[in-house]
Curated annotation (Swiss-Prot):
<keyword id="KW-0007">Acetylation</keyword>
<dbReference type="Pfam" id="PF00467">
    <property type="entry name" value="KOW"/>
</dbReference>
<dbReference type="GO" id="GO:0016236">
    <property type="term" value="P:macroautophagy"/>
</dbReference>
<comment type="subunit">
    <text>Component of the large ribosomal subunit (LSU). Mature yeast ribosomes consist of a small (40S) and a large (60S) subunit. The 40S small subunit contains 1 molecule of ribosomal RNA (18S rRNA) and 33 different proteins (encoded by 57 genes). The large 60S subunit contains 3 rRNA molecules (25S, 5.8S and 5S rRNA) and 46 different proteins (encoded by 81 genes).</text>
</comment>
<dbReference type="InterPro" id="IPR039660">
    <property type="entry name" value="Ribosomal_eL14"/>
</dbReference>
<dbReference type="GO" id="GO:0005730">
    <property type="term" value="C:nucleolus"/>
</dbReference>
<dbReference type="InterPro" id="IPR005824">
    <property type="entry name" value="KOW"/>
</dbReference>
<dbReference type="GO" id="GO:0003735">
    <property type="term" value="F:structural constituent of ribosome"/>
</dbReference>
<dbReference type="GO" id="GO:0005829">
    <property type="term" value="C:cytosol"/>
</dbReference>
<comment type="function">
    <text>Component of the ribosome, a large ribonucleoprotein complex responsible for the synthesis of proteins in the cell. The small ribosomal subunit (SSU) binds messenger RNAs (mRNAs) and translates the encoded message by selecting cognate aminoacyl-transfer RNA (tRNA) molecules. The large subunit (LSU) contains the ribosomal catalytic site termed the peptidyl transferase center (PTC), which catalyzes the formation of peptide bonds, thereby polymerizing the amino acids delivered by tRNAs into a polypeptide chain.</text>
</comment>
<keyword id="KW-0689">Ribosomal protein</keyword>
<dbReference type="InterPro" id="IPR002784">
    <property type="entry name" value="Ribosomal_eL14_dom"/>
</dbReference>
<dbReference type="GO" id="GO:0003723">
    <property type="term" value="F:RNA binding"/>
</dbReference>
<comment type="similarity">
    <text>Belongs to the eukaryotic ribosomal protein eL14 family.</text>
</comment>
<dbReference type="GO" id="GO:0000027">
    <property type="term" value="P:ribosomal large subunit assembly"/>
</dbReference>
<dbReference type="GO" id="GO:0000470">
    <property type="term" value="P:maturation of LSU-rRNA"/>
</dbReference>
<dbReference type="Pfam" id="PF01929">
    <property type="entry name" value="Ribosomal_L14e"/>
</dbReference>
C-alpha cells in the first residue's frame, strides 16, 4: 500500500535585499524601510528615503519582515532605493494591506476621547441589537 505525500515549500519571509521591513524600536519606530545589504546573521543595512528613515545598520530583532519585496541591487545608494521604491509602489501596497489598516485602526482607537469611546460603545450596542433582532425574526 503506497501513500502519496505532498511536499509543500516553506512560506517564510526571507531576509533578502529588497525586502521591506517595519521598524519596531528606536527613533524610526513604525516606519518602513528596505534592506539594502545583509551585514551578518543578525544585522542588515536598511534605507527608507520615502519614510524618512536614515541609512543605518540595524539589528534584525528591531525590525519585522513584511511580505513586500521589490527588485533592488545589493548595496544600492539612497537615490536608487528611492526610485525603485516609487516604481514598485511600495507605499500604496503597504497602505492597502490589512496589516497597515490594523495599525492605523489601533492608532485611531488610542487617540479617541472619552466621549468618542462612549459613542463607539453605543453604536456597538445598537449593532448587536439589530443583529439579535434579525436572527430572532429568521
Amino acid at each position: 500500500m503506497s501513500t502519496d505525500s505532498i511536499v509543500k515549500a516553506s512560506n517564510w519571509r526571507l531576509v533578502e535585499v529588497g525586502r521591506v521591513v517595519l521598524i519596531k524600536k528606536g527613533q524610526s519606530a513604525g516606519k518602513l524601510a528596505a534592506i539594502v545589504e545583509i551585514i551578518d546573521q543578525k544585522k542588515v543595512l536598511i534605507d527608507g528615503p520615502k519614510a524618512g528613515v536614515p541609512r543605518q545598520a540595524i539589528n534584525l530583532g528591531q525590525v519585522v519582515l513584511t511580505p513586500l519585496t521589490f527588485a533592488l541591487p545589493r548595496g544600492a545608494r539612497t537615490a536608487t532605493v528611492s526610485k525603485k521604491w516609487a516604481a514598485a509602489a511600495v507605499c500604496e501596497k503597504w497602505a492597502a494591506s490589512s496589516w497597515a489598516k490594523k495599525i492605523a485602526q489601533r492608532e485611531r482607537r488610542a487617540a479617541l476621547t472619552d466621549f468618542e469611546r462612549f459613542q463607539v460603545m453605543v453604536l456597538r450596542k445598537q449593532k448587536r441589537y439589530t443583529v439579535k433582532k434579525a436572527l430572532a425574526k429568521a
